[in-house]
Amino acid sequence: MTDQGLEGSNPVDLSKHPSGIVPTLQNIVSTVNLDCKLDLKAIALQARNAEYNPKRFAAVIMRIREPKTTALIFASGKMVCTGAKSEDFSKMAARKYARIVQKLGFPAKFKDFKIQNIVGSCDVKFPIRLEGLAYSHAAFSSYEPELFPGLIYRMKVPKIVLLIFVSGKIVITGAKMRDETYKAFENIYPVLSEFRKIQQ
């Protein structure tokens, strides 16, 4: 399993990450179709790590420790898996949930596994003038500090949303492939450098 993005562990490939910074993957959201109807009440009663409160939410919420994830399992057989730190771990976790459902007596399959969202983050290690950035990139930016402390930057290519904080911390969301996360960060990095706050 390649788990890139551990700062300081290997030298950064500057051809792919010219900024010298590799965003760390924080959360992967994936979906899969178990391709059979499920009795959620029966699953909740038999599985140790499951909760089901149909008045609150129409899915069983199941958790496993390894990889540390949460699954939402719907009566239609659709499942959402969140919390994994890499695509491989997300798929591994989804397979484990499918196996748990199989062991409870349902003919669960593993169809159409798909990564739906990758959330990454990084720290450029310098403060950013968000007002200036918002003003000069008004078409892509929304910045209302009294509502939310970060600037929301909607990049068109790749179609990614970045949350940019004055501290230099960046959250990158909306990618379906990790390379989009990396590309979006490399696209924004020169802009962040341009609006670097000069320390007095």
Curated annotation (Swiss-Prot):
GO molecular function: DNA binding
Any Pfam family hit: TBP
Protein name: TATA-box-binding protein 1
Modified residues (N-acetylthreonine): 2
Top-rank lineage group of the source organism: Eukaryota
Quaternary structure, from the entry: Belongs to the TFIID complex together with the TBP-associated factors (TAFs). Binds DNA as monomer. Interacts with TAF1 (via N-terminus). Interacts with MEE12/CCG1. Associates with PWP2 in the nucleus. Component of a nuclear protein complex containing at least TATA binding proteins (TBPs, e.g. TBP1 and TBP2) and ATX1.
Localization terms from the record: Nucleus
This protein's UniProt keywords: Acetylation, Activator, DNA-binding, Nucleus, Repeat, Transcription, Transcription regulation
Annotated Sequence repeat ranges: 25-101, 115-192
GO biological process: DNA-templated transcription initiation
